[in-house]
Amino acid sequence: MTAPLRRRGPRPLPLHLILGASRGMAAIASAAMPRLPDGSPSWSSAWPGLNGAAPRISPAGLAEARRIGAALAAANQPAEAFQAAVIRRLLRADRALLAGIAAYRRHPYMRTLADPPVIWAEGGSRLLDYASGAPGTPVLFVPSLINRAEVLDLMPGRSLLRHLAAQGQRPLLLDWGWPGEAERGFNLTDYIAGRLERALAALPGKVVLAGYCMGGLLALAAAQRRPDRVAALALLATPWDFHAEDADRARTAAALLPGLEPVLAATGTLPVDAIQTLFAGIDPFGIPQKFRAFARLDPASERAAQFVALEDWLNDGVPLAAPVAREALGGWYGANAPARGAWRVAGAAVDPAALAMPSFIAMPARDRIVPPASARALAERLRAPTLHVAAAGHIGMAAGSRAEAALWRPLLTWLRRL
């Protein structure tokens, strides 16, 4: 008997199905087209209405096509047979993608970790205490606003927060929650100078502030504003120079903002599926590929459960308050305001060089969301930070199979030296 569907992802599903099938469709279309002298498909001959605006194969693609053509000629093999084999291979990949998505959506895994005690709450936000009564300086973790906070407490054996608690630290987590009516009007100043600072005020004495991804920028600004409450600062996979490695891609994301305005105005948020679509542009074919690989896993294996746990977190996103979406897309990605010294919170410029407290920068070596150069630019602005290059990716550093070696232990070592 077929198990019932349990989840909706990967989101947005139509986009990922189209991306997954696009290679096969392009191969079929290319095989039917007339050829140009250089061996590339004549898109304009097949569709005259394109009037020269059709895509052309890159020089690297043409070189590979010529290499394959020469190899086929040397082996006296017809190009048509090779094309047919490629199309069959791509169609099998499409079937594997569908199988992987179906296996994910029916997988029995469910997150069962119980939440730790809530010691403060405001609106939809909660402050969770993972080691109440533990000695030493509390470590307050600030996650991104666009994902659930659970990535730092994913599942047994994959929880940075529970690992630190087991090692004698007192980690706390600011769970931003779902933006309600009040939060939909929040801008970044409201989140930082308002809610985050009030969470700090709920704790006795100074804390170590630790921000992950977008949360690192929020933590940085709060630390600059409240050095009386922040003893040290840890920034994990935190961007600073949004134009460091691919300014065109950042500007392209910002250029989408006018088209998103009707949705922002109507809902007061940037919806989850819109956010997921923006992230899909970073690696359009990566998501279909990982679901093809998932189709080959034993559903009862630990690897399968870990895959599902991460995908559940990724697909259970949180909409972004419209004012924050405008600041992030237009100000951060479009204008590169942080790196230019133009990002302001409550009227004051955010400047890492103004911080005198100890700092720790964790820069993933393989990060497509926050390129290493973007995070390194932040380290270069801080006063003598401890820079740790994590041998992992953006999410893997926090909750992957190598997270303990890549981030958890180095962060713990730094905390113990404070």
Predicted regions and their residues:
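Catalytic histidine-centered segment of alpha/beta-hydrolase-like enzymes
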Residues: 369-372, 392-406
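Catalytic histidine neighborhood in serine/cysteine hydrolases
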Residues: 379-396
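Alpha/beta-hydrolase active-site loop
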Residues: 185-202
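Alpha/beta-hydrolase-fold enzymes
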Residues: 2-73, 204-205, 218-323
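Short, surface-exposed "cap/lid" segments of acyl-processing enzymes
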Residues: 104-105, 112-180
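Gly/Ala-rich beta-loop-alpha elbow adjacent to hydrolase catalytic centers
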Residues: 210-219
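Short beta-strand/loop motif that positions the catalytic acidic residue
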Residues: 355, 361-363, 367
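Short alpha-helix in the alpha/beta-hydrolase fold that links the catalytic acid
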Residues: 357, 371-380
